[in-house]
Amino acid sequence: TINVEGTDKAHSYDMPFSAVHVIVPKERTEEALIAARDAGARGVTIMEAHGMGLSEMDNFYNRLHASATDSNLMFITKTKNVDNIIKSVLTKLDITGEGQGLTFAYPVSHIKGLRLKIDDI
């Protein structure tokens, strides 16, 4: 069910949606948010994260208690926006190697509670 902003209407629409995740060091969170917004993202859920490479798995227990060093930004967006959002973040943050950031997307269904502007439908 999609809520239409500015009205009391909620409808079921047959629209493909995806989740785009952008995981970046905390200090680059604002840059990533701006890049995604400029590419069409309209809302975000921000989660604290802490990544580790396979070489760090030997001391896995101690890493469980490490403080978060990254932000996991999750954008629910129309599938047609996915490529633009990912390209914008990768380009503007110059994410090219290990430890600099990560992006991925996957399709989602059965969305409830999402609010869209009438122009976005």
Put a short name on every predicted segment.
Residues 1-121:
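Positively charged, small/polar-rich N-terminal and surface patches that mediate targeting and assembly
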